[in-house]
Every structure is written in structure tokens, then in C-alpha cells.
Amino acid sequence: MTGSDAGYSAYYVSTGSVGLTDGDYVGVTSYSTTVGSYTEGTQGYQMSDTDGIMMMNTSTVSAVDSVSLDLFVQSTSWETSDYITVSFVGTTTTVLLDTNGYDIDLDFPTYEGAWTTVSGAVSGTGYLSVEFSSNAATESIYLDNIMFYSDGLDLDLDDDNDGYLDVNDDCPFDATEYLDTDGDGYCNIPVSYTHLT
């Protein structure tokens, strides 16, 4: 990713309910009555009363070491069927927050009614995914200030690309060798003897 802004895509998964057809709010908004103000600028991303599963995914970014976003969870009565999952999806998935199967009121009360920064260490190339499921008009979340961080170092853990990590490779710069079985500091180079005549 170059520049300072990442794009995003939104997806909806129907669970057999009325979905977003009953006047629900989803998307970029400047509506701030619930949140007071946004943490970065005058707009944020809102998901409310989805009556299904709503997902917002950022565009893919490279060489990421950590990620953060600001999350506002509306203070209301939540059920265990409502959930918020925040993940970084790359070669592997790093879950930063998962309320699935919990009651947000009881198990995540500090998230309600205030902006909370959700962050974590991640690695490599991937995208941030926020998944939200709720079934009441008072159940809303707001997202803002999504940030990807990188120290700028792209570590090459296998310098000779022979499939053995440098920490396990006695010959990290020789792709044809990886062992030094006698410990003399020289790789196990096959020796061929020829007779001199």
C-alpha cells in the first residue's frame, strides 16, 4: 500500500431475517449524536441493526507489523446472538476482538458508550476485517481511525532461499548446503577425489 488511505469493501450475509430493508444505517456517516465526535475527522463508519451479518474489509496492505482501529459500541441491551469480530486476515488470521457467544453487556462492558482502541501485533500482508451481527435498532457500532503500522524492515529469514530458516541453517548463504555436521565452520561440501596421473 502506498499513500495514507486504505480503501474498503462492505459485504452483507443474510441470515433469513429482514436484513437491511427496515431502514438501518450502514456506511460512512457524519452522524455523531450517539458517539459525540469521531476520533479522526468528522466521519466514521457505522453499522446498525444489521439483521444479518455485515462485514467491512479494508484493502490489502503489505509488510504490516501492527494494526489498530477505534471502535464505539452503543450502550444498549445486547444478546449473546449479537457479536463483533475484528481480525487481520493474511496468511493466517489474527483475531483482535471476538464477542461471539458472549453478552457484550456482561463480558465487554468497557466497550460500551466510549471510543476504545482495538489493536494488536500482526505480520505480513493482509487486510483488516470487521464483522458485526445484531437484531435491534439500538444496536450499533462505529469505526474510525484505522491504522496500519510497519517498521519498514522486511526481514528475510531464509537468505539463501533453500527452505531452511537462517537460524537452523549452518550455511545460510549457500543454497546447496545447510549442514556443518563436524562443527568446523565449513559446510558439508562433497569432496570428489581424482587420481593424478
Regions found by a protein language model. Give the residues of each.
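Extracellular glycan-recognition surfaces and repeat-rich motifs
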Residues: 1-42
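Short beta-strands within extracellular/lumenal beta-sheet-rich domains
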Residues: 45-62
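Extended, low-complexity, turn-rich repeat/linker tracts enriched in Gly/Pro/Ser/Thr and Asp/Glu
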Residues: 63, 73-81, 136-138
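Extracellular beta-strand-rich recognition modules
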Residues: 67-75, 126-134
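Short, surface-exposed beta-strand/strand-loop-strand elements in extracellular ectodomains
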Residues: 83-88
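Extracellular carbohydrate recognition and processing domains
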Residues: 93-124
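Extracellular carbohydrate recognition
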Residues: 133-150
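Extracellular calcium-associated, cysteine-rich motifs in secreted modular proteins
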Residues: 152-196
